[in-house]
Design a protein with these regions (language model features):
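Carbohydrate transferase catalytic cores enriched for Leloir-type hexosyltransferases
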Residues: 1-382
Length: 382
């Protein structure tokens, strides 16, 4: 370094707008970078939000450049900026480093640009995106990847798929895993467990799912497997906000006559999730594909046995600490649910393996990688 202050701006738009996966990643990686900020660094934030929401502590301490544009309008402006080569520093400032976390990289010539790549579902599972979102991502992500100085994937699976589709990424591709928050650990305090159980009207024993309610999460299959398992003393608790085409899962509950067996909690704040995981007999995650699959790691960190799909990045996250199954095999999932619940030895083994596996994923390690990257690039920057 030359003695001048290095300005790093992170796009926290997905955090402010409460986007589940990208929002969590952007918030936590920024917290970790901010907590370990070097004397010659200045952390800043950028976000756009038409509802004028604010960042929560401690990120509200960051100097911030903000816009109130709707997402579609902001995307249009970025597309126009690339087409006409119009720098967007007036909106964002003059960062030395810009970390794009929302699959959107503003046109910032001269800045060192990190681009976070969560997944390539807009290509591999395009049916899970709206037409406009799919079209934008298919058109612009290749341009963003070319413009980026470093492409940061959230799993090896995502990086390898990106390299196969966009070989020009070459040696500027890296992996910085999402981390498991330090508060995700087994909850043993009976008072806290009872409080969370009462708050969400939870039964004594249940199977747990945590995630957005949308088709790619494959809840329709899980509901069928749960019904087939016929575990009379267990209910299914579904935690998460309603996403795109959530009605399919709701309709399936009625078709199967599971109204009294399924509990929908809606969104649950982060502070309550460790107790929810700790109360569950098993965590089930039947997603068709994931860029990472953070709930799997969080459940393991809380000592909850995990049953998840054997697709995309999930085997990478779960390692040997979960039962992995094809996401479309209803019978296999039904049998696995019964097995985990009834086999005390298996239940204990998965718990211990999961606790060890979850320790692999920390925000501090990923923040250290991101920092090392931008400092190396800055040192070589003309």
């Amino acid at each position: 370094m030359t003695g001048r202050i290095l300005s790093i701006t992170v796009d926290l738009t997905p955090t402010v707008q409460n986007h589940a996966g990208l929002g969590r990643y952007a918030e936590e990686i920024t917290r970790a970078l901010f907590a370990s900020c070097q004397p010659d660094e200045r952390m800043c934030a950028f976000y756009t939000d038409p509802h004028r929401r604010r960042l929560s502590p401690p990120l509200d301490q960051l100097p911030a450049s903000t816009l109130t544009l709707p997402n579609k309008l902001w995307r249009s402006k970025v597309m126009l900026a690339y087409a006409l080569h119009l720098p967007q520093n007036q909106a964002i400032g003059q960062p030395d480093v810009f970390f794009a976390t929302d699959h959107l990289l503003p046109y910032l010539p001269g800045a060192i640009k990190h681009f976070l790549l969560a997944d390539l579902s807009f290509l591999s599972h395009s049916q899970t995106h709206t037409f406009l979102n799919r079209t934008f991502l298919q058109l612009m992500v290749p341009r963003f990847l070319r413009a980026a100085d470093a492409v940061i994937a959230i799993s090896q699976c995502t990086l390898q798929e990106a390299l196969s589709r966009y070989p020009f990424i070459g040696n500027k591709g890296y992996v910085a895993y999402p981390g498991v928050g330090q508060h995700f650990r087994p909850v043993l305090d009976p008072a806290r467990l009872d409080s969370v159980r009462a708050r969400y009207h939870l039964p004594e024993r249940f199977v747990l799912y945590v995630g957005t309610i949308e088709p790619r999460k494959n809840l329709v299959m899980l509901l069928g497997a749960f019904r087939q398992a016929s575990l009379a003393d267990l209910k299914l608790v579904i935690v998460g906000k309603r996403g795109w085409l959530f009605q399919e899962a709701l309709a399936r509950v009625h078709e199967l006559g599971l109204e009294d067996q399924v509990i929908w909690t809606g969104f649950v704040p982060d502070d309550d999730l460790p107790a929810l995981y700790s109360l569950a007999q098993v965590f089930a995650y039947p997603s068709l594909f994931e860029g990472f699959g953070l709930p799997v790691a969080e459940a393991m960190a809380c000592g909850t046995p995990v049953l998840c799909s054997n697709t995309s990045s999930l085997p990478e996250v779960a390692g040997d600490a979960a039962l992995l199954l094809p996401p479309t095999d209803v019978c296999a999932w039904s049998q696995a649910l019964v097995r985990i619940v009834q086999d005390v030895s298996l239940h204990a083994d998965l718990r211990e393996r999961g606790l060890r596996q979850a320790k692999r994923f920390t925000w501090e390690a990923s923040a250290n990688l991101v920092r090392a990257l931008y400092r190396e690039l800055y040192a070589r920057h003309p």
